[in-house]
A protein has these predicted regions:
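Tandem repeat scaffolds
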Residues: 6-9, 14-151
Length: 151
């Protein structure tokens, strides 16, 4: 991971929006990927950081809250007990653990309706049964090792 991305991660962990903006925007503009690799964000409140185009690889986001934006990418990361209540997000996740996630009727992982809807996709991820049912109601795509289900 680059020194710039490390400083961005440190600013997010410190909940320091001015430092985040100072580090990010000269180097990484809106719509460009911000890639975090092997970073710890456990317990972090992302409320003031729009996370669109954030990429988390091999990261720990356990017990984080207010993860929102589109798209957000997770690969081989622990995202356990994350608080998604009131959040709107489009997530692409592969090989992650989302067990224990919190959500409510305001939580939205699909934008729009029908074939043109933007849908979150969870590939080979660990999910609680209740979360899978919640995703089914919304139309989230869940892809497992042995089958492809559009729920």
């Amino acid at each position: 991971m680059s020194p710039i991305t490390r400083r961005i991660a440190a600013a997010i962990r410190a909940n320091d929006l001015p430092a985040y903006q100072r580090e990010r925007y000269p180097a990484i503009q809106e719509g460009e990927f911000v890639r975090f690799v092997n970073e710890g964000f456990s317990g972090v409140d992302f409320d003031q950081f729009v996370m669109g185009f954030f990429v988390f690889e091999d990261c720990n986001l356990d017990n984080a809250k207010h993860i929102y934006g589109q798209p957000i990418y997770f690969t081989n990361s622990s995202v356990r007990n994350v608080d998604f209540r009131g959040v709107k997000a489009i997530i692409e996740a592969e090989g992650c653990d989302f067990r224990g996630m919190k959500y409510d009727k305001e939580t939205q992982f699909v934008y729009g309706n029908g074939e043109l809807a933007a849908r979150s996709r969870f590939m080979n991820c660990r999910l609680d049964d209740a979360a899978q049912k919640f995703f089914m109601r919304q139309g989230v795509e869940i892809i497992s090792y042995d089958k492809h289900l559009k729920l």
